[in-house]
Amino acid sequence: MARRQVGSTRRVGDGGSFPFAGALHSKSRSSPLLSICLVLVGACLLIGYAYSGPGIFKSIKEVSKVTGDYSCTAEVQRAIPVLKKAYGDGMRKVLHVGPDTCSVVSSLLKEEETEAWGVEPYDIEDADSHCKSFVSKGLVRVADIKFPLPYRAKSFSLVIVSDALDYLSPKYLNKTVPELARVASDGVVLFAGLPGQQRAKVAELSKFGRPAKMRSASWWNRFFVQTNLEENDAPSKKFEQAVSKGLYKPACQVFHLKPLH
């Protein structure tokens, strides 16, 4: 069977400027007290913005806007309605793999006729009580994805992975990606960072183990061929149609995959 090159959907977000930069510059010769007040007011507004919003989980997308980082896990939550259109019944039993999986599981469980589970690859000691309740109920597991996943083959209709693979070396990708495909019956959706996107700072390296590696679409396509994966045509086309209609504007690379038969 001829192998199809896997396409990706992406859109690089427009840059923005810090809203208080002009004010601080114009007041540079004012009294030190006024300058300090402006800085404090700006900081309070940003912190309030980052932690506001509906839902029991803080939005990592909003936090990323403040810190300058970008999270593909936040993208997953934005893309859920479009993924449901693309996969239909394939969204019955979903496994999400990646950092902050509790927030994704929470969003998925709000969808009708959708069951959801998550694998958190990193420590969750700082997680809130709602996330820890997911762990106690078995909806979320903390597991090192460098090793086999604790699930039987085709346990889930769809597996969605975000952010986690960007921190793995090719050595471990060769083991982890086939594992993701093994536990999925209808396919795997990979949300990967774009080259040039900012990710983990030095302070976070102790958690992730290594800096994020933002790989190009061509790199991923070669890798998929090597690991016997191909584009999942039908849902990929539906997803692209939704993007072309403006229903969703991805800021990460999105790959729709299935095993090569």
From Swiss-Prot:
It is found in: Golgi apparatus membrane. It is a single-pass membrane protein. One of its GO terms (molecular function) is methyltransferase activity. The keyword NAD does not apply. Residues 57-261 are lumenal. The chain crosses the membrane at residues 36-56. Glycans are attached at N174. Keywords: Cell wall biogenesis/degradation, Glycoprotein, Golgi apparatus, Membrane, Methyltransferase, Transferase, Transmembrane, Transmembrane helix. One of its GO terms (cellular component) is plasma membrane. GO terms for biological process: carbon utilization; leaf morphogenesis; methylation; pectin biosynthetic process; pectin metabolic process; plant-type cell wall biogenesis; plant-type cell wall organization; positive regulation of developmental growth. InterPro entries: CGR2/3, SAM-dependent_MTases_sf. Its main location: Golgi. Residues 1-35 are cytoplasmic. Disruption phenotype: Plants lacking both CGR2 and CGR3 (cgr2-1 cgr3-1) exhibit severe defects in plant growth and development (e.g. shorter hypocotyl and primary root length due to reduced cell elongation, and abnormal pollen tube elongation), as well as reduced levels of pectin methylesterification associated with decreased microsomal pectin methyltransferase activity. The double mutant cgr2-1 cgr3-1 also lacks uronic acids and methyl ester. Its EC number is 2.1.1.-. Together with CGR3, required for homogalacturonan pectins (HG) methylesterification in the Golgi apparatus prior to integration into cell walls, essential for general growth and development. Promotes rosette growth. Impacts carbon (C) partitioning, photosynthesis and respiration efficiency by influencing leaf mesophyll cell walls morphology and physiology; pectin methylesterification modulates both expansion and positioning of cells in leaves, probably by changing cell walls plasticity. Belongs to the class I-like SAM-binding methyltransferase superfamily. This is Probable pectin methylesterase CGR2. It comes from Arabidopsis thaliana. The lineage of its organism: Eukaryota, Viridiplantae, Streptophyta, Embryophyta, Tracheophyta.
